Amino acid sequence: MDENTVAVKVEEISPVKKKLLFDVPWEDVKRERDTIYRNFSRTAKIKGFRKGKIPRKILELHYKKHAEEETVSSLVSRLYWDALKEHDIRAISQPEIEQQGIEEEKDFSFSATVEVEPQIDPQGYLDMTLSKEEQTVTEDEVDGRLEDIRKMFGTLEEVTEDREIRKGDFVTIDFEGFIDGQNPEEMKRNDYFLEIGSNTMVPGFEDQLLGEKVGTIKEIKIIFPENYQINSNVAGKDATFKVTIKNLKEKKLPELDENFVKNFDKYESLDDLKEDVRKSLFEDHKRKTEADMSKKIMDKLLEMNDFDAPSSYVERQIFFMMMEARKRLITTGMDPAMIDQVSASWHDKYKDEATRIVKSSLLLKSIAQKESIDVTDEEFEERLREIARQYSQDYEKIKDSFNEDMKENVRNDILNKKVFDFIESKASVSMIEKEKTSPEEAN
């Protein structure tokens, strides 16, 4: 086929969508169809005829519909890919093909609509005015982290004194819930073990057990949150729970002294432990500060650069987010049928966030291209080594276990950080005092 005889017109439907219109001369269609029939002739089995010797009219009698479908498929596929190459179109979605089939002695017309990445000329990323929190570690934060470590080595002991329940206690309870006049099975539990203050239950449930004693039968009234994901059928509704308090335990913590340090091989003294805690907190603050700075930069960039996000990218991101959310719920032991019910509303819920993620990625990519920022092989290798160290794995095993998509994600993470660092290096950055936290918040 002489491709130059095929007329191709490109229409821009939107900044992220193009429509390719093809007009294929009848002679080219006929030639393609003849080729299809010749191929059929070599392989077709029709009673009374030898393979390769079947007359064309007999083939048409048996295979006309199939031959025309094959002709259309062959023409569309080849011409579509040739047109993308010729017009330098980088499609990011499967084409939406529109065609009416072949008509004898008539040119064959079809169209292919595809999504493309928007052409972005990034603005406003140079000379930004930004604020950054100082990276300091307070004694309250160190004390809070040490308290967390003590709790890891605490032991649960039954409370024998006649006292009220307080925050941090562990209770064993039976409960049943009533909503809309019903007493559903999923709102009943026996011997349920609960840490008061863990926020495991619906907001307000645990607070209403404070001050109560073992043996009490307590009526608790709550309102399910409007965005309650575990069961959307009860979201926003009033409910009453009948709770029987059966047992009370408290966690006894070890003294924070030199003897406590013997629980760890890597520390020789309490001061060593405190210093390591301080370093860990500093790294936590550093990561948080970088994340906060990246968000500030991204907020400004998105405000100054308005463009459409390709729907195929957004849908792909929504799908990924839904799968991750589903995995998290599966690990909680939630019934799959309940997960299906809950996830019905996730698509709309995640759409705005997914759109932001897609637009952010495209915008950072455009800045990287404009400023010739890329990821070197050395940077990629070093990041893989960091991942191996983080998970205490052999570097070669980590490297071999990463498929191409995973490697691309690592490269994108490195590239995004380099772009953020570049923007920050060109910005006017003022340091602000770190917001003070209480010991409870630090904990």
Curated annotation (Swiss-Prot):
Gene3D superfamilies: 3.10.50.40, Trigger factor ribosome-binding domain, Trigger factor, C-terminal domain. Residues 168-254 form the PPIase FKBP-type domain. It comes from the Bacteria. GO terms for cellular component: cytoplasm. InterPro entries: PPIase_dom_sf, PPIase_FKBP_dom, Trig_fac, Trigger_fac_C, Trigger_fac_C_sf, Trigger_fac_ribosome-bd_bac, Trigger_fac_ribosome-bd_sf, Trigger_fact/SurA_dom_sf. It catalyses: [protein]-peptidylproline (omega=180) = [protein]-peptidylproline (omega=0). Its EC number is 5.2.1.8. It is found in: Cytoplasm. GO terms for biological process: 'de novo' cotranslational protein folding; cell division; chaperone-mediated protein folding; protein transport; protein unfolding. It holds the Pfam family Trigger_N. It is an enzyme of class 5 (isomerase). Signal peptide: none annotated. One of its GO terms (molecular function) is protein folding chaperone. Keywords: Cell cycle, Cell division, Chaperone, Cytoplasm, Isomerase, Rotamase. Consists of 3 domains; the N-terminus binds the ribosome, the middle domain has PPIase activity, while the C-terminus has intrinsic chaperone activity on its own. NCBIfam families: tig. Belongs to the FKBP-type PPIase family. Tig subfamily. Involved in protein export. Acts as a chaperone by maintaining the newly synthesized protein in an open conformation. Functions as a peptidyl-prolyl cis-trans isomerase. This is Trigger factor. It comes from Syntrophus aciditrophicus (strain SB). The gene is tig.
